[in-house]
Amino acid sequence: MKRPDYRALQALDAVIRERGFERAAQKLCITQSAVSQRIKQLENLFGQPLLVRTVPPQPTEQGQKLLALLHQVEMLEEQWLGDENSGSTPLLLSLAVNADSLATWLLPALHPVLTQLPIRLNIQVEDETRTQERLRRGEVVGAISIQPQALPSCLVDQLGALDYLFVASPDFAQRYFANGVTKSSLLKAPAVAFDHLDDMHQAFLQQNFGLSPGSVPCHIVNSSEAFVQLAKQGSTCCMIPHLQIADELKSGELIDLTPGLCQRRMLYWHRFAPESRTMRKVTDALLDYGRKVLKQDEE
């Protein structure tokens, strides 16, 4: 049986986390040459590349499996040695989450564990359709995703849903939708997407108005909070979680352009199995808070 050197695995992990050999070497307090040598030793042991040397570097399929193994071992070490290591460096938890969860409910949900446990968060923002892939690659130990099925050797629980409303400022609505929200008026109204793969706005318009993808003018802005600002200042119409704009809707600063219609995104919490004591507390915090603020199946 091939048994990897965990110092070499930590070097591989550092290169992926730090997005390069130089920063990985600084993080590990060794030379770049030493980082390269450790990874080369691993590759020789397994007889195949573990790293695609792109910018930034990416793990191969075998590299992903080894990173997942490392993270599971770290979780198990924390579980069995946590009390003895209570004064050591805080445990690093890398999580892949969607921007809207980060902007609304995630940080309040994590507040209890952040104040009670010695952990360091490494939050990686990704679309909820792609966060699970980061868990598959071993880049994170937990992910918030729309995928209901667990990966092999992983656990999954339903968190609840974010309901997205199609909103704009009253001024924007008057300029573009004075005669109602119609197919023709939507073709002229600028929208906004998080990135080029974010199709929520287009999917909503296609489903409810029959508009083909790509037919609406659309800004690209990588910030959930910026969506709210753009809508409030009358620059765009967009899909925003009700949870994020409840106050603006109540005050009339934003209006729901299509009352009765929403786009529901059910979210799931994925993580490696078995869970350590710390990870179990993170899971409990997310599930407890999610049940309070996110929409559940029966709602």
Curated annotation (Swiss-Prot):
Residue ranges for the DNA-binding region feature of this UniProt entry: 21-40
- What Pfam families does the entry give? HTH_1 (PF00126), LysR_substrate (PF03466)
Gene expressing this chain: argP
UniProt-listed PROSITE patterns: HTH_LYSR (PS50931)
Check the record and name the Gene3D superfamilies matching this protein.
3.40.190.290, Winged helix-like DNA-binding domain superfamily/Winged helix DNA-binding domain
Q: What is this protein called?
A: HTH-type transcriptional regulator ArgP
Annotated keywords? DNA-binding, Transcription, Transcription regulation
Q: Coiled coil: which residue ranges? A: none
Q: Which GO terms describe its molecular function?
A: DNA binding; DNA-binding transcription factor activity
Function comment: Controls the transcription of genes involved in arginine and lysine metabolism.
Could you say which protein family the record assigns here? Belongs to the LysR transcriptional regulatory family.
Source organism (scientific name): Proteus mirabilis (strain HI4320)
**Subunit composition and interactions:** Homodimer.
Protein origin, superkingdom: Bacteria
| Annotated ranges, domain HTH lysR-type | 4-60
